Amino acid sequence: MWQCGSCGYMWDGEEAPDKCPKCGAAKEKFTKLEDKAADIVERSRFTNDLHMQLYVVLEQVIAVAEDGIDDNLDPNCVKIFKRAAEKAEILQQSIKAELQGHMKKGKWG
């Protein structure tokens, strides 16, 4: 596994690419990750993907809740929809914070 020193792009392969697919940096800008670091990246990919999938589902929760708030059938319904939207937003922010922590610890790529 290789990482671009210019933009951080991770490349899976035995050799670095001729140029970075993201930023176009030359092959020389890539550094090979040590096995332990590469293992951490590989291990974290599944969990990071789950976080991103959950984030998308929470976007749907917010959209449904907003529709329910707009529908305004009765106060109890609106209360539930508002609570759902608030909780979904908190969870989304928590996911962003968690992923940022993963990036700082090399658990991303």
Where are the language model's segments positioned?
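Short Cys/His-rich micro-motifs in 6-15 aa windows
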Residues: 23-35
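C-terminal, charged low-complexity interaction regions
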Residues: 96-109
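Long, charge-rich boundary regions
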Residues: 33-94
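Residue-level signal for alpha-helical context at structural boundaries
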Residues: 25, 37-41, 106
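Short cysteine-rich clusters marking metal-coordination/redox-active sites
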Residues: 4-7, 20-23
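Residues immediately within or flanking Cys/His clusters that coordinate Zn2+
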Residues: 1, 17
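Short, flexible, mixed-charge glycine/proline-rich loop motifs
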Residues: 8-14
